Amino acid sequence: MAENLDISELSPIHPAIISRQATINIGTIGHVAHGKSTVVKAISGVHTVRFKNELERNITIKLGYANAKIYKCSNEECPRPGCYRSYSSNKEDHPPCEICNSPMNLVRHVSFVDCPGHDILMATMLNGAAVMDAALLLIAGNESCPQPQTSEHLAAIEIMQLKHIIILQNKVDLIRESAAEEHYQSILKFIKGTVAENSPIVPISAQLKYNIDAILEYIVKKIPIPVRDFTTAPRLIVIRSFDVNKPGAEVDDLKGGVAGGSILTGVLRLNDEIEIRPGIVTKDDDGRIRCQPIFSRIISLFAEHNDLKIAVPGGLIGVGTTVDPTLCRADRLVGQVLGSKGNLPEVYTELEINYFLLRRLLGVKSGDKNTTKVQKLAKNEVLMVNIGSTSTGGRVMMVKADMAKILLTAPACTEIGEKVALSRRIEKHWRLIGWAKVVEGKTLKV
């Protein structure tokens, strides 16, 4: 069905595509233990899925990606929001409605990026490795609002310029109606003047699955279909890679390495010629860094349990290649960029960046004002630079008011205008101190 589709006519809600893979990414954010993962479970049912196959399991669990199909009942009389239902991504396209038994239509296939602890979250959000189109902000009704991380996450969303947010007031089953009303007022006060100001606020109980159908209706109605350009050169950021061969397999049965990641732009098809950059990085006799891109061909594509003929941006995609499996084993390719041959951006060893520092450290509570303030960049200090899904060290060579020159410890495939996150080592932890835009850099001859 998908082979003879015309790429220019595809859209992220084309039935042939959403029946097999997710096309919209939604992040779940909020304070610790406010129920982010529980909401994802309530919508996608994913914690109950025992994957048929280790492959997908490796990919989806570590990062907390879960896909869900959202259906709407075809019967006009069926009362909303009960006419919306969600199932896991291997459900058929027209299941019967549980209320009136009419067939339901698949309207969206979404992928939830379930963000873990906030420090990591900040880096992933800024990295754009989680290409989020929208966010669910969770606020628990049985604690006062705002909790410290709730406000940081809002700051992070503002940096990322995410416009579409749905606020979920969780755990309403634990509080009285009057308390819920007061808490609702405190949420309104908290979001005033931020990006989330006019966002809908839905009272829910993720454990009891109360009002989950209302969230689905908002996801379908409030979150616009992201504009995706399927005609540009494809690019995928690798976040997992592995060797799928069992020890002792026959030589003829060996399979190539598998890379998993999210596609940023374009479309990947079976049998495409691809290139992976920076590839194999070595040093020559003079100590200069060389890199050798890896060339290969796509032999399989899959999303959760579904084999694909073509893969579009959204959710996590596994790409089976002809690459030597030892190059892929145990996440060796993480942070590399995969794309069509000859169309990938340059590999840089030095970056000139235009940087912005946060006013104070996030997530550090301390009585002393000075410790939480972010100090200016110093010459020769070593920062951690997150580019896409690569984390590499960077030594600050030169600093001006808002510009800095950074020498990377490992070459990175990036392009001018890309956003990177900067972290500094504070009390034995890497802490996010700001973000930057790549202005120019020194490229490696590949």
Swiss-Prot record:
> Which GO CC annotations does the UniProt entry carry?
cytoplasm; cytosol; eukaryotic translation initiation factor 2 complex
Q: Belongs to which family?
A: Belongs to the TRAFAC class translation factor GTPase superfamily. Classic translation factor GTPase family. EIF2G subfamily.
Matches recorded under Pfam families: eIF2_C (PF09173), GTP_EFTU (PF00009), GTP_EFTU_D2 (PF03144)
Q: Which InterPro entries match?
A: EFTu-like_2, eIF2G, eIF2g_C, eIF2g_dom_2, eIF2g_GTP-bd, P-loop_NTPase, T_Tr_GTP-bd_dom, Transl_B-barrel_sf
Annotated region described as G5, given as residue ranges: 205-207
Q: Coiled-coil annotation: which residues?
A: none
Q: Which GO terms describe its biological process?
A: formation of translation preinitiation complex
The UniProt function text for this chain reads: As a subunit of eukaryotic initiation factor 2 eIF2, involved in the early steps of protein synthesis. In the presence of GTP, eIF-2 forms a ternary complex with initiator tRNA Met-tRNAi and then recruits the 40S ribosomal complex and initiation factors eIF-1, eIF-1A and eIF-3 to form the 43S pre-initiation complex (43S PIC), a step that determines the rate of protein translation. The 43S PIC binds to mRNA and scans downstream to the initiation codon, where it forms a 48S initiation complex by codon-anticodon base pairing.
Highest classification ranks of the organism? Eukaryota, Fungi, Dikarya, Ascomycota, Taphrinomycotina
Principal EC category: hydrolase
Task: Provide the residue positions that the database annotates as binding GTP.
Answer: 33-38, 170-173, 205-207
Q: Return the annotated region ranges for G2.
A: 58-62
The name under which this protein is listed is Eukaryotic translation initiation factor 2 subunit gamma
Q: Which reaction does it catalyse?
A: GTP + H2O = GDP + phosphate + H(+)
Instruction: Kindly state which keywords UniProt assigns to this record, in alphabetical order.
Output: Cytoplasm, GTP-binding, Hydrolase, Initiation factor, Nucleotide-binding, Protein biosynthesis
According to its UniProt entry, this protein's organism is Schizosaccharomyces pombe (strain 972 / ATCC 24843)
Q: Where is this region: Interacts with cdc123?
A: 436-446
Enzyme Commission (EC) number: 3.6.5.3
Task: State which gene encodes it.
Answer: tif213
G1: region residues:
30-37
Subunit composition?
Eukaryotic translation initiation factor 2 eIF2 is a heterotrimeric complex composed of an alpha, a beta and a gamma subunit. The factors eIF-1, eIF-2, eIF-3, TIF5/eIF-5 and methionyl-tRNAi form a multifactor complex (MFC) that may bind to the 40S ribosome. Interacts with cdc123; the interaction is direct.
Residues of the region (G3) are 114-117
